[in-house]
Amino acid sequence: SLIQFEKMIKKMTGKEPVVSYAFYGCYCGSGGQGKPKDATDRCCFVHDCCYEKVTGCDPKWDDYTYSWKDGDIVCGGDDPCKKEICECDRAAAICFRDNLNTYNDRKYWAFGAKNCPQEESEPC
């Protein structure tokens, strides 16, 4: 679920997820189009694509099982669909952490769709 994803992001990056990522670049937050603007925005693009591949459950609302082991996220549970959601969220949270050095909220926060032309969109 989005709430679990927020917790993963907070723990991995130390940032407040909604403030830091919900309005970043062309793909972080709701929707997405255009070309990802930097590595963090690409994390969101890949996460959106990952969610598109999930079938049989709702990535935004269905809770899944996960735990922390040695600073890493471990997805668990018996439901393969929910585990898939968890793996999408896990990969994005790690991606955000690994790209903190190029995160640029001054440049890409509240970027707006007008700066993300539909014709520049990439396939998943």
Curated annotation (Swiss-Prot):
It comes from the Eukaryota. The active site is at residues 47, 89. Ca(2+) binds at residues 27, 29, 31, 48. The keyword Lyase does not apply. GO terms for molecular function: calcium ion binding; calcium-dependent phospholipase A2 activity; phospholipid binding. GO terms for cellular component: extracellular region. GO terms for biological process: arachidonate secretion; lipid catabolic process; negative regulation of T cell proliferation; phospholipid metabolic process. Its EC number is 3.1.1.4. PROSITE patterns: PA2_ASP, PA2_HIS. Binds 1 Ca(2+) ion. Its cofactor is Ca(2+). It catalyses: a 1,2-diacyl-sn-glycero-3-phosphocholine + H2O = a 1-acyl-sn-glycero-3-phosphocholine + a fatty acid + H(+). Expressed by the venom gland. Disulfide bonds join 26-116, 28-44, 43-95, 49-124, 50-88, 57-81, 75-86. SMART domains: PA2c. It is found in: Secreted. InterPro entries: PLipase_A2 (IPR001211), PLipase_A2_Asp_AS (IPR033112), PLipase_A2_dom (IPR016090), PLipase_A2_dom_sf (IPR036444), PLipase_A2_His_AS (IPR033113). Keywords: Calcium, Disulfide bond, Hydrolase, Lipid degradation, Lipid metabolism, Metal-binding, Secreted. Its main location: secreted. PLA2 catalyzes the calcium-dependent hydrolysis of the 2-acyl groups in 3-sn-phosphoglycerides. Belongs to the phospholipase A2 family. Group II subfamily. D49 sub-subfamily. This is Acidic phospholipase A2 BA1. It comes from Gloydius halys (Chinese water mocassin).
